[in-house]
Regions:
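Regular, well-ordered alpha-helical segments
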Residues: 13, 25, 39, 43, ...
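Short helix-boundary/capping micro-motifs
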Residues: 14-30
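A short LG(V/I)-centered, amphipathic sequence patch enriched
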Residues: 42-59, 64
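Acidic-residue sensor for enzyme active/binding pockets
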Residues: 4, 16-17, 31, 42
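Short alpha-helical "packing" element that flanks the helix-turn-helix/winged-helix DNA-binding module
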Residues: 7-14, 66
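The N-cap/first-turn positions of alpha helices
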Residues: 4-7, 31, 56, 63, ...
């Protein structure tokens, strides 16, 4: 499966911020664009990566390993 690198970047920034508004600002995109791209990535992977609720956004069990793998690549 070929993943869109833009979607992966959006995932990484959202996983760091855990806030759609701040992540969208960092990425210089509108919040609805970020939301659509994350949902599209979740469909591509057939896994929910984030839980969204009144208490905010957090990584799901499926999203946490992906975030750790990405963090491990930083030098």
């Amino acid at each position: 499966m070929d993943l869109d690198l833009r979607k992966v970047r959006y995932f990484v920034v959202l996983a760091e911020e855990l806030n759609y508004r701040r992540a969208a600002e960092r990425l210089y995109v509108a919040q609805p664009v970020l939301t659509r791209q994350i949902r599209s990535l979740e469909r591509d992977l057939t896994a929910q990566l984030f839980e969204r609720g009144r208490a905010g956004t957090r990584l799901t069990d499926a999203g946490r390993p992906a975030r750790r793998r990405r963090a491990g690549r930083r030098g």
